Amino acid sequence: MSSYKLFCMGNPLLDLQVRDGEKLLEKYGLKSNDAILAEEKHLLLYDEIVKEHEVTYVAGGAAQNAARGAAYCLPPKSVVYTGCVGDDDLAEQLKAANKREGLDEAYLVKKGEKTGACAVIITGHDRSLVTTLRAAEKFEQSHLSSEAVAPLVDAVQFYYMEGYFVTHGLASALELAGKSAAKSKCFVLNFSAPFIPQFFMPAIQQLLPYVDIVIANESEAEAWASASGHPAPTDLAAVAKSLAMQPKTNPARPRVVIFTHGAEETVVVNSAEPGRVRTFKVDKLAEGEIVDTNGAGDAFAGGFLGALVAGRELDDSVEAGHKLAKISIQQIGPQFKWPKVQIL
């Protein structure tokens, strides 16, 4: 019998972090503080980084970051993650990074494909992110019903998915979310980036009836509000209410909407009490304590999920999210402190 409580799905990427990357920025025409998908002119960048620079490998990909965060908070064998990787050295690096955090993976491995990667080029306090999805967008729905994965899907009580996954894997997302709703389990969706509700709104709206908890930041909330024709897209409280009250397949389980807003208060609305908007203060860091905010949203989701899976109340789960995000912001990339800090 599986002991896993949380099943996460997304695009597995290995972050390749290099410092003093001014020459790389110049050579590949990159901005110092940016995040883009790789174009053809960037494709040699990854090999060059590995061969000619001192690389720090960090397991990346939004849902994988959140899954590692949840695993950091929970006992071993609590969290399992799936996504598609290639049969290459990057996948092995990814497995090693996950093992450090206590995250187990059930990858679909595509022979002859390259694992997705994100080049993180650091210059001073700036970070230029260049992502190539590669194998990540080759995920197959049949993997969810495979002999290795189906028992994991059935055993857990919680599911988590990044919004990025709907760009190529909507059928898989709907299968997982549908199973969750049918058994009155908890399905959590993170919007992940403003372009997801902006350009993939039909996919989001198709998935939403099965979603029990939505996590988004203020920009993603505004993008969803604009795409859905909301009259006041920057009014986080009003948007949270509207999102909470969208149609739901399993009305027995109320929908919770959580909007983070950087160092500002986190907004929470529960469809069981749509008139009540709750806010949670963020314990702000001094400017000098902030090392890297990349992955802070994923760390929040990880801490929140860890507490939720451990049976904590919603309030405590939001606070656990804040706590893990604060730790992550003081590290390079989406990483956590060792020896472990007690989150729960």
From Swiss-Prot:
Names of the cofactor(s): Mg(2+)
Gene Ontology biological-process annotations: AMP salvage; purine nucleobase metabolic process; purine ribonucleoside salvage
Record's PROSITE patterns? PFKB_KINASES_2
UniProt keyword list: ATP-binding, Kinase, Magnesium, Nucleotide-binding, Purine salvage, Transferase
Q: Which protein is depicted?
A: Adenosine kinase
**Leading EC class:** transferase
Q: What is the lineage of its organism?
A: Eukaryota, Fungi, Dikarya, Basidiomycota, Agaricomycotina
A Gene Ontology cellular component where this protein is annotated is: cytosol
- The species this protein was found in: Schizophyllum commune (Split gill fungus)
Q: Which reaction does it catalyse?
A: adenosine + ATP = AMP + ADP + H(+)
Quote the pathway field.
Purine metabolism; AMP biosynthesis via salvage pathway; AMP from adenosine: step 1/1
Say which domain of life the source belongs to: Eukaryota
